[in-house]
Design a protein with these regions (language model features):
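Active-site beta->alpha N-cap acidic-glycine motif
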Residues: 1-68, 72-86, 173, 189
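Catalytic domains of cell-wall/extracellular-matrix polysaccharide-remodeling enzymes
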Residues: 62-187, 194-198
């Protein structure tokens, strides 16, 4: 099972990494270019990779108008992947579309562009809804538990204070259920997009 964190890096990245290290869990992060450009966050970006986590791209702007209506999805993802490479030395190919691939990647043309750019896309199987549950870690934990039904789950979370509070309990739950934690690997990509496009 895969824990994933969107919208970093942030002032909470280091604290999330501390919890993951303490629990001996590797995770997958989808980071935003505008935040990656903040030099104050870059040490923790390097630390993320150093401690065995994967960093994929979550666009430069997180702006659905630009990404999906003005044709900037692939250019923004490439720019973000380049930033990740420049900071960490890794060469990731995985991206997560802001707001998910449905409806953003509905059009065949945008998906063709993604394939041409040799980019892979990941959505999620469990939405924790953490971003809108300020001061309510208990509900985040419940959301994750009640959606867990499959052998392989990909949990969508964000770098938020309430998520940090919920994280130890979420990890404990999965360990008790006998799940093994995985970290994304470009070599072992499996399809996980709401458009069910085998190419992505």
């Amino acid at each position: 099972m895969y824990l994933t964190f969107d919208d970093g890096p942030s002032e909470l990245t280091g604290k999330i990494l501390d919890v993951l290290k303490e629990q001996n869990v590797a995770s997958t992060f989808f980071m935003q270019g505008s935040n990656l450009q903040n030099t104050g966050f870059q040490e923790n970006v390097k630390r993320t990779v150093k401690e065995g986590h994967y960093i994929g791209a979550h666009s430069m702007t997180h702006n659905s108008e630009k990404l999906y209506k003005k044709g900037q999805f692939v250019p923004e993802m490439k720019e973000t992947l380049d930033l990740i490479h420049n900071i960490t030395g890794t060469t990731p190919k995985l991206v997560r579309p802001p707001y998910g691939s449905a409806p953003g990647l509905k059009g065949e043309e945008i998906r063709d562009q993604i394939v041409e750019a040799a980019i892979k896309v990941w959505d999620w199987t469990i939405d924790s809804n953490d971003w809108k549950l300020k001061d309510n870690p208990t509900q985040i934990i419940e959301n994750v538990k009640k959606q867990t039904t499959e052998e392989v789950e990909v949990v969508l979370m964000h770098e938020k204070a309430q998520t940090l509070q919920a994280l130890p309990e979420i990890i404990k739950f999965y360990k008790e259920q006998g799940y093994e934690f995985g970290v994304y690997n470009d070599e072992d990509h499996f399809r996980l997009n709401f458009q069910k496009d085998q190419r992505l």
